[in-house]
């Protein structure tokens, strides 16, 4: 066994954990990654943008990731009959604009995780232990000890990194209970994620709508020579969003370029105590029953498709949207990365981008100061804190969920009218949908190994 002063435990095998492990290994650490789940990840689409794209290039993974993207060609709002209210908003901003409704890299979380895990596991000084949790942690002056569930034995490390998401076990085990409690900032937005089969009857109208406007569709692998989508595709490459009153919305998006599967999102904006309780403690059966009751009355084909798909989905996941906010991302020799330390929530679209950037900076600072982790962890916070704060800002002054999921029929009419205006005029391309303004400058050589 390697000396504990070069051995790091990363708890969590998602994007944050796998990227952290990759760069720590490049920096000369021996890395153990513990991942509690051995099952299929739920079907959530994630975005990679800005500085995070530069980091995946450094990892040599850009082309593989681009080859695995969903192929989403844009997003459209549909009416109560499931018909587009206006042409889709695409992906290509005009000069002077920063808008991109569908991001540069849109990929399913499970696909991105596999790519990052494969890259980390290929390194000789990274070990993944699946079906394993961290049960106990004890801090010492020059090391930190963890009891891992797969052996039940204490093991010594120089540091433990919590890359274990919103409900981070490392945060709970190493941070003051009151600090941990106050770190969770809930919203009144709820979402269920799951996948459904593609359906060929949805492709033709989308292909016709996209054909006259090839500038909306830069996804060349999906388009014919005139810019229209391949009529042989199995389902539309366009995301579709339908609304109903009481703050409800259904969003269906591509999972892959062939259209054989779709990701589905049932969204609710509500102060309902029943929603809060079922999201927190309800069984999956309770959650599906509640959502069935809320969404079954949707008119048009989208509601029926979504509700029926929810009941047969094997990757269903329902949650209340929360953010994690802390004044420090470390406690002793334990540090947090990604959602565990600073989740911006899906409302910002920044979660995966933050996780990748955070993993790179954390590993870089640890490689620079392996014998002074207090300095490394403090620098990590100082470098990223302003960027994280910006990334956690929910669009439209925090009102985005209320605007996107109106409570009244009048509000839905206004939203659809606004969508028609920005779609037909093209002014959406001049809007800013949350692109980076705070720049992250650090570069690390990881001992010349990157």
UniProtKB/Swiss-Prot annotation:
Keyword Ligase: no
A Pfam match: FAD_binding_3
Record keyword Flavoprotein present: yes
EC number(s) recorded for this UniProt protein: 1.-.-.-
Record's keyword terms, sorted: FAD, Flavoprotein, Monooxygenase, Oxidoreductase
Leader peptide range in chain numbering: none
Phenotype upon gene inactivation: Abolishes the production of cercosporin. Leads to yellow-brown mycelia with significant export of colored compounds into the agar.
Induction summary: Expression is positively regulated by the cercosporin cluster-specific transcription factor CTB8. Expression is also affected by nitrogen and carbon sources and pH, and is also controlled by another transcription activator, CRG1, previously shown to regulate cercosporin production and resistance.
InterPro entries given in the database record: FAD-bd (IPR002938), FAD/NAD-bd_sf (IPR036188), FAD_aromatic-hydroxylase (IPR051704)
Gene Ontology molecular function: any one: monooxygenase activity
Pathway(s) it belongs to: Mycotoxin biosynthesis
Task performed by this protein: Monooxygenase; part of the gene cluster that mediates the biosynthesis of cercosporin, a light-activated, non-host-selective toxin. The perylenequinone chromophore of cercosporin absorbs light energy to attain an electronically-activated triplet state and produces active oxygen species such as the hydroxyl radical, superoxide, hydrogen peroxide or singlet oxygen upon reaction with oxygen molecules. These reactive oxygen species cause damage to various cellular components including lipids, proteins and nucleic acids.
Family statement: Belongs to the aromatic-ring hydroxylase family. KMO subfamily.
Protein name from the UniProt record: Monooxygenase CTB7
Organism of origin: Cercospora nicotianae
Chain's gene name: CTB7
């Amino acid at each position: 066994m390697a000396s504990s002063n070069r051995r790091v435990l990363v708890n969590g095998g998602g994007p944050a954990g796998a990227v952290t492990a990759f760069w720590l290994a490049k920096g000369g650490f021996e890395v153990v990654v513990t991942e509690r789940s051995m099952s299929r990840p739920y079907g959530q689409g994630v975005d990679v943008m800005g500085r995070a794209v530069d980091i995946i290039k450094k990892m040599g993974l850009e082309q593989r990731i681009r080859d695995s993207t969903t192929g989403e060609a844009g997003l459209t709002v549909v009416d109560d009959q499931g018909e587009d209210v206006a042409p889709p908003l695409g992906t290509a901003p005009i000069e002077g604009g920063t808008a991109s409704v569908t991001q540069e890299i849109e990929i399913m979380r499970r696909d991105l995780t596999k790519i990052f895990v494969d890259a980390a596991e290929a390194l000789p000084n990274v070990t993944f232990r699946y079906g394993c949790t961290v049960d106990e942690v004890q801090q010492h002056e020059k090391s930190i000890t963890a009891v891992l569930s797969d052996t039940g034995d204490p093991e010594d490390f120089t540091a433990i990194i919590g890359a274990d998401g919103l409900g981070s076990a490392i945060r709970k085990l190493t941070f003051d209970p009151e600090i941990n409690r106050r770190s969770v900032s809930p919203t009144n937005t709820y979402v269920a994620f799951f996948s459904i089969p593609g359906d060929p009857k949805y492709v033709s109208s989308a292909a016709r709508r996209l054909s006259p406007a090839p500038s909306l569709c830069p996804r060349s692998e999906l388009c014919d020579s005139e810019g229209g989508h391949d009529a042989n595709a199995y389902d539309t490459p366009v995301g579709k969003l339908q609304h109903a009153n009481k703050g409800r919305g259904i969003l269906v998006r591509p999972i892959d370029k062939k259209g054989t599967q779709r990701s589905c999102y049932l969204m609710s904006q509500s102060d309902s105590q029943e929603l809060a309780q079922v999201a927190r403690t309800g069984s999956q059966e309770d959650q599906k029953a509640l959502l069935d009751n809320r969404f079954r009355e949707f008119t048009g084909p989208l509601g029926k498709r979504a509700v029926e798909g929810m009941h047969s989905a094997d990757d269903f996941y329902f949650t209340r949207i929360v953010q994690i906010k802390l004044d420090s991302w470390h406690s002793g020799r334990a540090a947090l990365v990604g959602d565990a330390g600073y989740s911006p929530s899906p409302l910002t679209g920044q979660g995966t981008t933050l996780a990748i950037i955070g993993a790179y900076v954390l590993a870089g600072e640890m490689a620079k100061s392996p014998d002074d982790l207090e300095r490394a962890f403090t620098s990590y916070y100082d470098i990223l804190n302003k960027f994280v704060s910006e990334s956690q800002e929910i669009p439209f002054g925090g009102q985005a969920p209320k605007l996107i999921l109106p409570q009244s029929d009048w509000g839905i009419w206004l939203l659809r009218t606004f969508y028609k205006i920005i779609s037909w005029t093209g002014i959406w391309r001049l809007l800013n949908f949350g692109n980076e303004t705070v720049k992250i400058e650090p570069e690390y050589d990881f001992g010349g190994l990157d």
